[in-house]
């Protein structure tokens, strides 16, 4: 008599693996408070990278458990996997993180089977979870009412959010925050006896900062609220700002930032809380912002297929200069670009496909300091041919036939990255006012400086490789030539040996593979003479090799820079 197919046993192994992953994820996350209190800034960076890498490491580990525990012909009988899915659903129904466990199951399925075997019967292409569930548990938020003065309300907050390191000068902080609050909100709000503040109970940590996140509200209106805290070594903890502007808070949760460390027993409830105060953010971005980037990827994919099913949108080539390494296309009604690697690169490019993939994956694990767009990597996208503009599809088939192909009336994209769509900086400057040009070039230089101080050298710093977000921030998004700043050899151009050297079309000095000459930047970056002069006035030190060498020395000495995710006026 044949043995029953072990659907329940396979489902249990997958969920046990998820529990193991979540325990390790939580352990790293819970260490964030101690690292902040002890000012262990380099440990913070290492922990962030370790937590990102943890997911794939644990998927590989559980894949090994499954292959060891079940015979191949049993485990890999895909026709039986709807039984595994049903057994798994029964296991996760009582959980508080059940939406994440669906994504985990999908990752294990994809690690075992080729993508052409993906179906909603075998895995969770569409979620089986309700959008909002009510669980019996302790509240994840604290609420503070205005009883007398604003300062008293703020004092009550900081009494609840104490650390092992004391606040350096809490009275001064309270006075400053009260003043900022009065500047941010209408006078009637500050005097409204029904004014309340609701804060998420766990503190959010990222880089050198800790963040209290919540909202201010009256019966009629609400505003987001973020209070960033800094640990000034030797001077205690300081409340650095009070931010109520939705655009400013949105930037703090931007796709250009590293992921927060925050302990959230019920992730979906916290994401819904964030969604209420940041209605312009997609839930995919909010899940990603707190470290659940794989589930963010799931939510992104669901939003994409829903958009395609419910619109007449078609893929078109993205605006801007065609890439030398990547081909980029987009959906006009969906705020994302899709990037594929070309089969052949422009002759001036010395990288290969494997190097490009390595560079793009590197971006996931480094501190993006608000200046590099996050990416999601996908394999085996399948779309109806009718969803492509014919010229777009023809170009993709021409430049990347090993990646893009037609299977009947289906377009198969074997490998691609997605990024948030932005306006290319070169196109933005073409139509910008004088004031907008000044602001954009100021921010462009700051982006380069902040990336460099975080040990990232963009390599190709042309304007076309940077974009402008809806909030007006300049962000780098083309990663095929990035490297660690400490790997670059910055040099001054040697003086000419003879007068004839300056007239020669060839350099009179040797150039190594990692050599960079900042004096060559001005004509390389700017064809427009006016923009070149303006940028030289704003950020002329970028043309000096000694400036870059100074940054390298600071990085090698272990210095971790301060890059604030809120504008100076908020501080």
From Swiss-Prot:
GO terms for molecular function: [isocitrate dehydrogenase (NADP+)] kinase activity; AMP binding; ATP binding; phosphoprotein phosphatase activity; protein serine/threonine kinase activity. Its main location: cytoplasm. One of its GO terms (biological process) is glyoxylate cycle. It comes from the Bacteria. The keyword 4Fe-4S does not apply. Its EC number is 2.7.11.5, 3.1.3.-. Transmembrane segments: none annotated. The active site is at 374. It catalyses: L-seryl-[isocitrate dehydrogenase] + ATP = O-phospho-L-seryl-[isocitrate dehydrogenase] + ADP + H(+). The keyword Transmembrane does not apply. ATP binds at residues 318-324, 339. One of its GO terms (cellular component) is cytoplasm. This is Isocitrate dehydrogenase kinase/phosphatase. It comes from Pseudomonas entomophila (strain L48). The lineage of its organism: Bacteria, Pseudomonadati, Pseudomonadota, Gammaproteobacteria, Pseudomonadales. The gene is aceK.
